């Protein structure tokens, strides 16, 4: 955890996609990164085995009945270790992206994918943007609803 430096605090509610009964509400400072948000979600959902991840932020909604533009993707820094000739340069490094840089606002939604193999999809909503609390330690978990499902299904031998 780190001590407050940014003047903004972002309160984010994250739930497992398709299950509003399992959610975590987390607060982070504006100078923390999407990688910090990933680490907070990882811990809040009782995960133990690290995997790649990406955040997806819609650029703008499409007109009714049409798809909007491709969302901006912010992904794990490990994805940039080796050049990918097929990369269309549309991905951004989550560890280099501060929450303040995203200009988040209450009600804004995003998606978070953890583990590209098992595809743990989450839905996120910015619940509030508040003044940060001086000398507070971030990221605190403000609310935890429902039990986290196991990261891996039990295998019968």
Residue ranges and their predicted role:
Residues 1-157:
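Short linear regulatory motifs enriched in tryptophan with gly/pro/ser
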